[in-house]
């Protein structure tokens, strides 16, 4: 994850000037093509470096595994996003969920695959050409007040805790309602309990991160919708 954070921070800095002529098109090309390749390269370097540093002394006389075999031991999925006032980009490989509540309350899952993975099988960063499996959500925000009011990223342990996709959608809608009524502090206090309960149902780890639009922008969006 730290490798993603480093790349995402650099992308976020570059996105500050996305209104320069031609800049948005270059950023889109980088987000869809170069960023996934850079992410996989950084992850592979970190994984193989860890192998070299922590290889068991007892394995000293054993034949050296191929790089692909080493990477299988570190295989992982990833979902992450960059949010700026004028640009929203997200990347995903493997399982996990991105839910977006738009300014008008519509709920979208823009990175949901056309076909769900069977069982526990999923794409992973350890794949031979993993960058090809990275899904990208690209959404310029030409009107800051109409940007998404809530973005939720979570591991698949959360969505799997529900009997159907409708249950997950209802959870996100409920989260949005609670944030509106109680504020971030109130939800933050009870969220760990919700996630522990979800983990018990799914039998898998459950992690969630959310970004909530500042209240003054939400009010501006409501005023524009009414007008």
Regions found by a protein language model. Give the residues of each.
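PP2C/PPM-type serine/threonine phosphatase catalytic domain
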Residues: 1-227
